[in-house]
Amino acid sequence: MQDTNVFDLVVVGSGAAGMAAALTAAHHGLSAIVIEKAQRWGGSSARSGGGLWMPGNPVLREQAPADDIEAARTYLHGIVGAEAGTARIDTYIDRGPEVFEFLQRHTPLDMRWVPGYSDYYPEVEGGRAHGRSVEPKPFDARRLGSELATLERDYAPGPRNFVLTQADFRQLHLGLRNPRFLPRALAIGARWAKANLLRQQLRTRGQALMAMLRSGLLDANIPLWLDTALVAAREDDGRVTGVVVRREGVEQFVEARRGVVIAAGGFEHSAEMRERYQRQPIGTGWTVGARGNTGDGIRVGQSVGAAVEFMSDAWWGPSIPLPRVPWFCLAERNLPGSLIVNERGERFMNESLPYVEATHRMYGGVHGQGTGPGENLPAWLIFDQRYRNRYSFAGLTPRQAIPRRWLDSGAVTRADSLAALGERIGVPAATLAATVARFNGFAHAGKDADFGRGESAYDRYYGDPRQRPNPNLGALEQGPFYAAKMVPGDLGTKGGLVTDSDARVLRADGSVIAGLYAAGNASAPVMGHTYAGPGATIGPALVFAYLAARHAAAVLPARG
């Protein structure tokens, strides 16, 4: 083992939580280092939408309709309940604006409100239909220099400088059904041409967020070691004093005088942990999380006595298992002319539910919990040719043919009739026909009498305003008909190390493991089994990473 490296704070993981912890430490008088197992930095945060759900932040105060932070508190308590700890909820609400402002001061963080991107439960007291989510503006990442080459790749990469924001996607997915489609498409094209002319390196969504945070680390001269795997934590008299890592094939000890922050993501790519903790069917091939997320930080925490919670849950989303990468379905389920059935040919939910809730319904039981296999899996998204002609689907433009490899893989099935479609996917044809007929009646009436699809502002965000009287309901009548296989995909796992309001890791008896902190998907979620709104994963990751570093630096004066 090589000579010891000594830092005040050692941060494991280079996603949003890890970078926020290191930045906070550096600007509060501590020396810090970030270690990253992968050969690229950014983690799942770089593959995400990059949005933040942080009520009361300065961007919302400036751009969004007046909001009461107490309403956000009421809302979050209302949807989460007591299972994730009421003190942590209050801490998140109270400290969020402070964290946002800190990042604005010490990084080129530049965000904007996403109008109308609703909270995921807007009808709950305190929920907001106009939304509380902010997203990164397009960011020229040339300032990163050579570091840009090792940024974790985007989930859905495109041509250089052809980048889309969440606000762009909202205007494009309806195609020519949306009168704003052409103006927005022209604006995107002009942005692309200008960026190419100026030789920019534009990034949006999670790519932009992580490039902004990485800029802050570079400005603060915080070292980041790539290809450095966490092996173990070292304790001295009950306190974590550092970590053993493997770098360039050699194990070495990195001493942490103030503490270690585990921000290494979840365990979505660990088949063993998913098999142990999560309900079937499950696998590592349906996630869009970073490949390095194999639960290393969680296991190391457990090895020193840490408790874990919510290990059976994830940041789920119904997904299509396409041959190369899974497609995480956002708008597809909300658009008129589609419905979801189980293998019995029955609808079992409002298809337009927020993605975590929708996948919980696919598994069945309260919050998707249970001991047996999922009750409504496999599931199928059924749609017709009119739907395909009108709307984008899984990255395809309206009317674009379904790729042959999708059909050959079984991810998507096509047939001239509903009866033939049912036979091909193993669903009772008569039941499927009856289900579609009943649904078509709801579509013509404009009211889903079974599941209330289209009644929530969240449902309508991805709906078609030109579809009357309900933007989420349309009859399936024009063949050929299609079935896209729906699997329980995810953005990452939810469960992790139990922490308190200072992000200190706790044992099962509630006692603190001194010197050990956790944030992000390595920690148990403040959101519990729910998901408050767009950006409700990264928002808490930033806040509790900041609080971990602040706690570690508590006896030292801040530098700004």
PLM features per residue range, with description:
Residues M1-L9, H27, Q207, A211, ...:
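Extreme N-terminal leader/targeting segments of oxidoreductases
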Residues V300-A307, A433, P540-R559:
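Internal hydrophobic alpha-helix adjacent to the cofactor/substrate pocket in enzyme cavities
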Residues K37-P223, I340, R347, R386-N389, ...:
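Conserved N-terminal/central alpha/beta ligand/cofactor-binding core
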Residues Q200-Q207, D219, R247-W327, I538, ...:
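Glycine-rich loop(s) and the adjacent beta-strand/alpha-helix scaffold that form part
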Residues L9-V34:
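N-terminal Rossmann-like FAD-binding beta1-loop-alpha1 element of flavoenzymes
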